[in-house]
Amino acid sequence: GVIQNGLYLGLIFLALTKIDSNVSVIIASILPLTVAFFSWVFFKSRLSLLGLSGLFVGLIGVLLIMIQRVEKEYEILGITLCIMGLLATTFSTLIITKININKNNILIVVGLQMLAGSLFLLPLSYFFEVWSISFNMTFLFTFLYIAAFPGIIGPVIWFYLQKEIGAVKYSSFHFLVPFFGIAISYFLLGETLTFSDMIGVIVIIIGLYLVNRDKKGF
């Protein structure tokens, strides 16, 4: 809870005040590679050439989609915060994979994780945040959406997949973040899809296929 909800999400939110969101997506997409590397360092886990190739192919697909969307200069502080957040979620992923969690208790674990993260952030927010909230429909919808999807549904799926398919194969699905981002932008915001976007999506799918064809896993 402290690592994932407190450090990772807290650092990413801070980073987004300093850098373009597209840059943060590119950095976050390195997660499968950092998980694979630290799994090898700490647990001597190995990924086959096929699986490793899939990770790099997926990352190339992400770059094809996102690099064209980086429009403004970025601050070194924002990059640093984003990398720290990446490392936090890397270690959180490895810890969850290795500890024994009963699948029937996942909701309880998610609740405790959110509680631990909120207790960690509460004193920090008291001293460093402005306690002023404008209660309106936009705030209410945003709050409920974040609580339901990133707060509850996402972590439940996160815990389940890590126990079922392993850390590296699970983290490889982070490559789909830019895909869903451009899909939502296209259908809801009317943004234009480029040829590079379509090629990037195809490359990401190939990368995911290669990773999940790897029988060794982690």
Which functions belong to the PLM regions below?
Residues 1-28, 64, 147-165:
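Specific transmembrane alpha-helical segments of multi-pass solute transporters/efflux pumps
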Residues 1-12, 77-85, 134-153, 174:
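Loop-to-transmembrane-helix transition segments
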Residues 1-2, 47-58, 78-79, 104-113, ...:
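Cytoplasmic-side transmembrane-helix entry/capping segments in multi-pass membrane proteins
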Residues 2-6, 10, 32-37, 63, ...:
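Hydrophobic/small/kink-forming positions within alpha-helical transmembrane segments
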Residues 10-11, 37, 59-73, 116-139, ...:
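Membrane-interface helix-cap regions at the ends of transmembrane helices
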Residues 15, 41-43, 47, 99, ...:
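Hydrophobic/aromatic residues within transmembrane alpha-helices
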Residues 30, 38, 47-67, 86, ...:
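Hydrophobic transmembrane alpha-helices of multi-pass small-molecule transport proteins
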Residues 35-37, 41, 73-128, 143, ...:
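Transmembrane alpha-helical segments that form core, pore/gating elements
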